[in-house]
Amino acid sequence: MALYDEDLLKNPFYLALQKCRPDLCSKVAQIHGIVLVPCKGSLSSSIQSTCQFESYILIPVEEHFQTLNGKDVFIQGNRIKLGAGFACLLSVPILFEETFYNEKEESFSILCIAHPLEKRESSEEPLAPSDPFSLKTIEDVREFLGRHSERFDRNIASFHRTFRECERKSLRHHIDSANALYTKCLQQLLRDSHLKMLAKQEAQMNLMKQAVEIYVHHEIYNLIFKYVGTMEASEDAAFNKITRSLQDLQQKDIGVKPEFSFNIPRAKRELAQLNKCTSPQQKLVCLRKVVQLITQSPSQRVNLETMCADDLLSVLLYLLVKTEIPNWMANLSYIKNFRFSSLAKDELGYCLTSFEAAIEYIRQGSLSAKPPESEGFGDRLFLKQRMSLLSQMTSSPTDCLFKHIASGNQKEVERLLSQEDHDKDTVQKMCHPLCFCDDCEKLVSGRLNDPSVVTPFSRDDRGHTPLHVAAVCGQASLIDLLVSKGAMVNATDYHGATPLHLACQKGYQSVTLLLLHYKASAEVQDNNGNTPLHLACTYGHEDCVKALVYYDVESCRLDIGNEKGDTPLHIAARWGYQGVIETLLQNGASTEIQNRLKETPLKCALNSKILSVMEAYHLSFERRQKSSEAPVQSPQRSVDSISQESSTSSFSSMSASSRQEETKKDYREVEKLLRAVADGDLEMVRYLLEWTEEDLEDAEDTVSAADPEFCHPLCQCPKCAPAQKRLAKVPASGLGVNVTSQDGSSPLHVAALHGRADLIPLLLKHGANAGARNADQAVPLHLACQQGHFQVVKCLLDSNAKPNKKDLSGNTPLIYACSGGHHELVALLLQHGASINASNNKGNTALHEAVIEKHVFVVELLLLHGASVQVLNKRQRTAVDCAEQNSKIMELLQVVPSCVASLDDVAETDRKEYVTVKIRKKWNSKLYDLPDEPFTRQFYFVHSAGQFKGKTSREIMARDRSVPNLTEGSLHEPGRQSVTLRQNNLPAQSGSHAAEKGNSDWPERPGLTQTGPGHRRMLRRHTVEDAVVSQGPEAAGPLSTPQEVSASRS
């Protein structure tokens, strides 16, 4: 029955029935009857003139059927049994069944039978038409190849052996290998003399190619397609996430015309067979059949000849979304790259191109692009929102309430739900609150029967409550309001879905966290047995999965199955969501549970990449179990000794084990927080630290927790109250902004390491300690400088982070910045008073590290700020010794030693000028030989700008008050630049002395002191506008402590 198929709309018998007896077609539709249609191959040319059409129309009666002319017919299994009224009691096979609809949407069934009911021949098999130049099944291929397939098997066995050795080769390697196997088998086939003669005919040659390709690919399909699936794993997961979010899509949403929707169910069934095809040729034939089904006319009255490419694309888009094929990208790659028997410039190639266009259209986000939040929910593709919230413009109070909830109109929602004032008015008009007189009864009943009353328990035609609508539309601000009005967080709709189900299905993490906070149950199963976690995994919403799992790991049931027996891990593995899988496995999801098909999550893995992730966690779990097993007691030990030992140490062992479990639990909670910080998940951080909106708004008014200043310890004045409130607040989870992991990393450390510039201010304003050290004695500023995160460094320095602290290796933040070549950070640190000649445990200064790492602009910047080239490291090498000969860095370093003394030498001498006019001129002569780097030019412009007045040593120490501010425009116009210093009351001779020096002054070290009134030392400090410095966040490394910057090359 399933082996034969034909287009009944082109069947001569059915066409004749429609043309000659349209009345019968209308009648059978009205009574929802059955039409018997003989297959095309069994019909003779005289069938229209001799056939009695009434005998082919069946009307159901008790326990059997009757034709319109009163004959009895029985349907037994896959056969038609003819009864009373027929001249010959035949048994006619049923080939297949289809359901048709007329223009009034009345349905009737058509049974395609092997031959007409009047047929007398002994043979009952249909003469099914077939394409003589097409092979559809592997059985057809084996029959065509005959004994040649045995020769192919030896080549294929060899391919299997070599593939295992070259499994990690490139895709092109495997394409070539498979093509070589195909070519070799085809060559063997053409060695047959008979087939060689047939190959001269193009049609026969194409048939041979198809046969070889189908056979070869069928035998190596598991190897090749598994590899392709691994290569396309990330693309498949991304595409699946888009299509899963579009399950509410309707045909009208993408412009599918009604006349094209009749064949969509058949096309969908055919497309679902794609993954059962084991060769590119078979997959293409499947796609072609889908296109053919789409373009078939549902009746003679509907002409589909004018179907354009856009109409076909709309239907294909709908099929791609609604057909559950989780590896579209792998299928496309497989078909395009491993089809060897034909070029793409044929009918099959056109079908493939059409599907590619539809898939690319979905990948671009054209169907899933969401408008900004300000545009409301009307343009979003939600769970039928457009149907009743915006498209149904009714005056129903419930519809009005739901519309305001969907659009986030909190004021109107609160007005509609505020019944307290009305109730108070009603009570005041009553004789007394418990009165049941006639007047009071009328008053109360009138209120109860008021159709305009809406409550948090009102429902629409889907069983949705206001909380359902707020959840499905992502209106987190309305969740608090609805719950405060009495909304039930665990209310279910007609499909058994709670608001938490819908929030997880749509991926709204903030709504999910709020519902969990209000005690929404994460274990409620809908009509399909799915929990909210199942839906979050189905649609790939990793944030919602984390919210559900992290809320309460102890009570979250990760291993509960739905009606198919699938756990959340089954679903995530089937759709290839690696992040979701890792979250589930990290929190104890089992990889050994079987669903109703006896499949474990490992067996459901979409590709080998997902499988390897789960296997790795499975092996690590087994190792942890083995390591946690206690050793067996020695049999030689006496019972008395064991009893005595247990009696004396039972309490201590129990308390120790409980403390150990408590510590492990605490560290698990801390790790969750640190992972959320590393991911930049602000909503999860807020939830774990229990920050409210009020906390964020009041963050500007908070003071540092490291050194709070109160009027007295218990003061609650307006100045001290915010800090007292923050310090007194301890989250129920025990987590705070200064908690640390086992390696000493705090949330601020992790945020600094990963460049989370948006989290740094919030953590600091909530009391994070910028001076906290991890196991390597590194502060957050060390990590930010090591990774080159400018905005993070700037925020930490603005929060008074100390720029000269050293870690375990003796490195300062400046040394890390110089080693990494981050010249913007170097300038920023120097501006905030970083010690320029501080050395690490190897004796290397910042200049050493910059020279070793060959960062010419950093070297130049350090020299301009007075870095000493005379400092020796522990190998007795200066920065000059570390530089390469005849390099640009050596050229920079050679200018300074001839005229710049070290800091100690300057202090011992008669405070001579730090840089002479001669060296300034010598240096400026080489200025334009350097690369044209904007930041470097900036410092040249600064040092050649204006005349400066001298300062006393006290004024030098307050150098942050005398910083010139250069605008970005002035940096690009050196002729117009102006540097403004705050003028101090200095003696006239000092001012004239400084004026005579002009541009010949060189920047001074900040540590110099004044020893005589006759000599003044001037320090120039320069501030760079933030807009000049690159502020883009860099990709952070893994969550780990910083490693010591290598300086071994010195």
From Swiss-Prot:
Cysteines paired by S-S bonds: none
InterPro entries: Ankyrin_rpt (IPR002110), Ankyrin_rpt-contain_sf (IPR036770), UPF0507/Ank_repeat_27 (IPR051248), VPS9 (IPR003123), VPS9_dom_sf (IPR037191)
Region Interaction with RAB32, residue ranges: 451-730
Residue numbers carrying Phosphothreonine: 1023
Keyword NADP: no
Domain of life: Eukaryota
Cellular compartments annotated: Early endosome; Late endosome; Cytoplasmic vesicle membrane; Lysosome
Chain positions with Phosphoserine modification: 962, 970
Location of region: Disordered: 625-665, 987-1050
Regions of compositional bias (Low complexity) in chain numbering: 638-658
A cellular component annotation (GO) from this entry: neuron projection
Chain segments carrying region Interaction with RAB38: 451-600
An annotated Gene Ontology molecular function: small GTPase binding
Compositional bias (Polar residues): 628-637, 1040-1050
Primary location recorded for the protein, binned into one broad class: other
CDD domains noted in UniProt: ANKRD27_zf1, ANKRD27_zf2
Region span, Required for interaction with VAMP7: 658-707
Outcome recorded upon mutating residue 509 to A: Disrupts interaction with RAB32
Domain VPS9, first and last residues per copy: 233-371
Region Sufficient for GEF activity towards RAB21: start-end pairs: 1-372
Physiological role: May be a guanine exchange factor (GEF) for Rab21, Rab32 and Rab38 and regulate endosome dynamics. May regulate the participation of VAMP7 in membrane fusion events; in vitro inhibits VAMP7-mediated SNARE complex formation by trapping VAMP7 in a closed, fusogenically inactive conformation. Involved in peripheral melanosomal distribution of TYRP1 in melanocytes; the function, which probably is implicating vesicle-trafficking, includes cooperation with Rab32, Rab38 and VAMP7.
Quaternary structure (record): Interacts with RAB21 (GDP-bound form), VPS29, RAB32 (GTP-bound form), RAB38 (GTP-bound form), VAMP7, KIF5A, KIF5C, GOLGA4. Interacts with low affinity with RAB5. ANKRD27:RAB32 heterodimers can homodimerize to form tetramers. Can interact with RAB38 or RAB32, VPS29 and VAMP7 simultaneously. A decreased interaction with RAB32 seen in the presence of SGSM2.
Identification of the protein by name: Ankyrin repeat domain-containing protein 27
Species this chain originates from: Homo sapiens (Human)
